From Swiss-Prot:
It comes from Pseudomonas putida. This is Probable phosphoglycolate phosphatase. Specifically catalyzes the dephosphorylation of 2-phosphoglycolate. Is involved in the dissimilation of the intracellular 2-phosphoglycolate formed during the DNA repair of 3'-phosphoglycolate ends, a major class of DNA lesions induced by oxidative stress. Keywords: Carbohydrate metabolism, Hydrolase, Magnesium, Metal-binding. It catalyses: 2-phosphoglycolate + H2O = glycolate + phosphate. The keyword rRNA-binding does not apply. InterPro entries: HAD-like_hydrolase_sf (IPR050155), HAD-like_sf (IPR036412), HAD-SF_hydro_IA (IPR006439), HAD_2 (IPR041492), HAD_sf (IPR023214), PGP-like_dom2 (IPR023198), PGPase_prok (IPR037512). Its EC number is 3.1.3.18.
Amino acid sequence: GTLIDSVPDLAAAVDRMLLELGRPPADLEAVRHWVGNGAQVLVRRALAGGIEHDAVDDVLAEQGLALFMEAYAQSHELTVVYPGVKDTLRWLQKQGVEMALITNKPERFVAPLLDQMKIGRYFRWMIGGDTLPQKKPDPAALLFVMQMAGVTPQQSLFVGDSRSDVLAAKAAGVQCVGLTYGYNHGRPIHDETPSLVIDDLRALLPGCEDPATGITLADLQASQDRESTVAVTGKFWMKVIKALARWRWRA
């Protein structure tokens, strides 16, 4: 939701899953409100027909998840990059800023999807929703990225589009920029009180930011020893030792 709009493909996979289970398809806008908390929660919400999903049978949910994952793996043709994303990532890379992608999307889809969108090369680290046990709003992912990059919360910025992103950033002591587009279950991102709210990532580039905020990507420009990082969600969930064993390094 921060970098790409993958809802059309997610909705198509949800509908195929529901069809296999003999259920009516979901509305695209309903799926847009359901995404953001990982594939398991999305499937349970689709089966429940709403945000609340506690009553969904666990066996049915597992069956639905398998069908959904199979369907989603087959096509990402409807996914698009949001305006301003490539310009911003390109600028950051030129400044030597190290970037990480932290998403609740299943890990197996993350790198191939970003490479298909031609933005995977910008990220040194990629963390999927099943890489570690903890998902956002747990701050573990942010803390681990900062440890790997050798930076402090004051040197970092987290950019996201949801309540989970804002809560994770606050828990990690990192300033958070909230985007007005993306997936926040129909709630305005202003309600989550991030450090700054913008409509387009390019608003953070030099000369575009609001001086009153005191936050710019220029402030995070890397020093000669590259001690800066920007963690970009859309979406560190596993024990640290397992994470180290499976870590996705990007040259």
